[in-house]
Amino acid sequence: MLFGKHPFTVVPNGIDTARFAARDPQRRALLRGELGVTDQEILFGHVGRFSDQKNHPGLLKIFAAVRTRLSKARLVLLGGGDPAYVEKMQALAAELGLGDSVIFAGVRSNIQSFYDAMDAFLQPSLFEGLPVVLVEAQTAGLPCFVAETVDRGAAFTDRVKFLPLNDTAAWANTIAAASFRRDPQAREKAIKAGYDIHTSA
């Protein structure tokens, strides 16, 4: 064991739960309008640096399969990275026939506003520890569809579905059958799980 017989304390990565749980219909409508997303469309989101670990190729293939079942689905990708890699993902999106259904939003400082604008969160990472973005998305009350490679200890709401990394059909079928209702008690659950920065630090 890392610490042997010595006592230790695990301190979760805390976030400002009030900030991420705040709902603002006007802010949601404004941001969706800026993105060109209508009220009738389902906006999926992903937050993460463009890198091999985050598995953007797999994410785009999953979303392409989702689009065959949910024609009004849109996807917003938040994060930076190597411009050449981003361009490669843009080319893949075009190759998959996704057109303007995928929004490459780049690096943003108002991430909490984007969680408010989303209807669901996707994270098909090749490997992860305990991703803070998943804590943020859950605190926002979002349904989260996550690869089985992610630590199950990261889930503290019943809105998290763990799915096999390489089974695109399983992802698409599960997502298409899902209810996109937010969890109204998400912040309380985040605090209870120890993720509030004011109590975990």
Regions found by a protein language model. Give the residues of each.
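A short helix/loop element that forms part of the nucleotide-sugar donor recognition site in Leloir-type
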Residues: 21-37, 91
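A conserved mid-protein helix/loop that constitutes part of the nucleotide-sugar donor-binding site
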Residues: 42, 46-65, 75, 84-88
